[in-house]
Amino acid sequence: MQIQVGSQNPTKIQAVKEMFPNIDVIGVQAESGVSAQPFSDEETKLGAITRAKYCAMNNPYTIGVGLEGGVMYIDNELYLCNWGALVTPENDIITASGARIKIPNDVEEGLLKNIELGELMDTYAEKKDVSKKEGAIGIFTNQLITRKEMFRHVVTLLKGQWMLLNSNNH
């Protein structure tokens, strides 16, 4: 059995490796099928599912995992959102969402000008490759939660549902 993560981003791959330490986990290039900067829960979730499906279809013994970050409005305020999907070799689709945090107004302004969050965060934090390290969540929480930890939480939710699906208790 192998798990393919639909991304080459090290934070996403490491989050999956930590939750599945006894399974071979690799990252593969997988298109999300959504915009480069998803702007709703629905679009972000769809991106995760599309990535996971792509990975699962490559091999009958492969679990596909898709992890997607996006933004969404709640009551006219923009929030960071993230979704994960796990697709089994039997084509069962499991989904989960994680942390949400309000995005500062100056970052929101950049997003509304069609600048991707990853690019904005490098400028906002005056750092390079924030999306491959602590992520926006790391910057916005003063490093208390990193992008890897945020995605690890989502992968934990996916793994728990997958374990239940494979148990005799459902």
UniProtKB/Swiss-Prot annotation:
Highest rank taxon of the organism: Bacteria
Required cofactor(s): Mg(2+); Mn(2+)
Recorded catalytic activity of this chain's protein: XTP + H2O = XDP + phosphate + H(+); ITP + H2O = IDP + phosphate + H(+)
Entry-linked InterPro entries: ITPase-like_fam (IPR029001), Non_canon_purine_NTPase (IPR002786), NTPase/PRRC1 (IPR026533), YjjX_NTPase (IPR050299)
UniProt keyword annotation of Nucleotide-binding present: yes
Example GO molecular function: ITPase activity
Disulphide connectivity of cysteines: none
Entry EC number(s): 3.6.1.73
Residues noted as binding Mg(2+) in the record, renumbered to the chain: E31
Swiss-Prot/TrEMBL GO biological process terms: nucleotide metabolic process
Cofactor: how and how many bound: Binds 1 divalent metal cation per subunit; can use either Mg(2+) or Mn(2+).
Keyword entries, A-Z: Hydrolase, Magnesium, Manganese, Metal-binding, Nucleotide metabolism, Nucleotide-binding
Family the UniProt entry places it in: Belongs to the YjjX NTPase family.
Function of the protein: Phosphatase that hydrolyzes non-canonical purine nucleotides such as XTP and ITP to their respective diphosphate derivatives. Probably excludes non-canonical purines from DNA/RNA precursor pool, thus preventing their incorporation into DNA/RNA and avoiding chromosomal lesions.
Assembly description: Homodimer.
PANTHER family: NON-CANONICAL PURINE NTP PHOSPHATASE_PRRC1 DOMAIN-CONTAINING PROTEIN, PTHR34699
Listed name of the protein: Probable inosine/xanthosine triphosphatase
The species this protein was found in: Oceanobacillus iheyensis (strain DSM 14371 / CIP 107618 / JCM 11309 / KCTC 3954 / HTE831)
Source taxonomy: Bacteria, Bacillati, Bacillota, Bacilli, Bacillales
